[in-house]
Amino acid sequence: MSWQAYVDEHLMCEIEGHHLASAAILGHDGTVWAQSADFPQFKPEEITGIMKDFDEPGHLAPTGMFVAAAKYMVIQGEPGAVIRGKKGAGGITIKKTGQALVVGIYDEPMTPGQCNMVVERLGDYLVKQGL
């Protein structure tokens, strides 16, 4: 299965009548492996900050997490594995695997729990595949 198929079929899938606003699979260096049409472009320093937070959980909490210059308040995730952010009525979930970052961005009416489920389910699958 191609990386684009993972995004299209597993991240942008319908959940209780709703979809993520955008999603992507990135390398740890920020290289885009696959993305949805509306996925925002990360800046290199944003990826650096996200990767540092996986290595040093809590690093982003004081300043917030920036994605394409949009600021997200960092909320509880799983140290070293999942970062979650909130911005207005939407948010973001980032799951780190051995080689990739699985990213989902949502807006209402999709819920944080639905976004977490979609992103983390694919991320957990990739971890089991050694990716």
From Swiss-Prot:
InterPro entries in alphabetical order: PFN, PFN_euk, PFN_sf, Profilin_CS
Coiled-coil ranges (or none): none
The entry's keywords: Actin-binding, Allergen, Cytoplasm, Cytoskeleton, Disulfide bond, Phosphoprotein
Processing after translation: Phosphorylated by MAP kinases.
Keyword hit for Cell cycle: no
Gene Ontology MF terms: actin monomer binding
Location relative to the cell: Cytoplasm, Cytoskeleton
GO cellular component: cell cortex; cytoskeleton
UniProt motif (Involved in PIP2 interaction) ranges: 81-97
Keyword Cytoplasm: yes
Disulfide bonds: C13-C115
Lineage top rank: taxon: Eukaryota
Assembly with partners or alone: Occurs in many kinds of cells as a complex with monomeric actin in a 1:1 ratio.
Note, other: The variability of the residues taking part of IgE-binding epitopes might be responsible of the difference in cross-reactivity among olive pollen cultivars, and between distantly related pollen species, leading to a variable range of allergy reactions among atopic patients.
Record's function text: Binds to actin and affects the structure of the cytoskeleton. At high concentrations, profilin prevents the polymerization of actin, whereas it enhances it at low concentrations.
Family note: Belongs to the profilin family.
Name of this protein: Profilin-5
Organism, as annotated: Phleum pratense
